[in-house]
């Protein structure tokens, strides 16, 4: 079963232009869905992504990528 990443293209703390390529580096075969995730509160202050239906957030994109690497299915 492939990994799935879901990210918002409207939240202030998430930079889609840099985050998407980094997620693809982590897992090139993952399904990626871009759109509102109804996670607006945390999305204003922290970078976030849903990984396999689990929300992950961190103060910086680098920290978020570290968390994503730990949560993906190998």
UniProtKB/Swiss-Prot annotation:
A Pfam short name: DUF1450
Domain of life per record: Bacteria
Coiled-coil intervals, chain numbering: none
UniProt similarity note: Belongs to the UPF0741 family.
Annotated protein name in UniProt: UPF0741 protein YwzC
């Amino acid at each position: 079963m492939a990994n799935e990443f879901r990210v918002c293209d409207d939240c202030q703390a998430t930079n889609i232009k840099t985050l998407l390529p980094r997620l693809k580096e982590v897992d090139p075969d993952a399904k990626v869905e871009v759109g509102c995730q109804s996670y607006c509160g945390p999305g204003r202050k922290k970078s976030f992504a849903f990984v396999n239906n689990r929300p992950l957030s961190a103060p910086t994109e680098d920290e978020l990528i570290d968390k994503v690497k730990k949560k993906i299915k190998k």
